[in-house]
Amino acid sequence: VGTSIEITVLRKGLSKAKIFKIVREIIEITSVKTKLINNEIGYLRLTAFNENSSNQLKKEISKIEKNKKLIGYILDLRNNPGGLLSQAVEISDFFLNDGEIVSTKGRKKRDNRKFFAKEGDKINGKPLIVLINNGSASASEIVAGALQDQKRAVLLGETTFGKGSVQII
């Protein structure tokens, strides 16, 4: 970040090269898009589970929660290929007060883990619908499954991709 590089470009038909200086910056990928439907439904679109997804979603939910007419939420996980397990756990926890979110089973017993929700449903118990399709994979399936298993959300859509797994590299 902050470092620069100079690129010299010689265009066809021109005799003089042009020099461009490019400075590196942090690029934050936005994986959360939100809107209010009819001023009463919070629509949360999650396109991936990257390292900033939970922070972005938390910020957007707190903005939407200020609306006094809000009656429920739609969490759209369609065509979300997944991403980081840690983000799937944090995002699931936003909508749960307790219960198991997911467990992982490794080749060695010490790699087996269980992840549980902490108290504090960020949407205060409002109804939640989760949209899924065959493009919902991996972390998307973990979130959808956890919310369904805990009877916290209704899933609507198609059968998911069927990955529902975690790889550690």
Language-model features, listed with the residues they occupy:
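Cleft-lining beta-strand/loop regions that shape enzyme active-site pockets
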Residues: 1-169
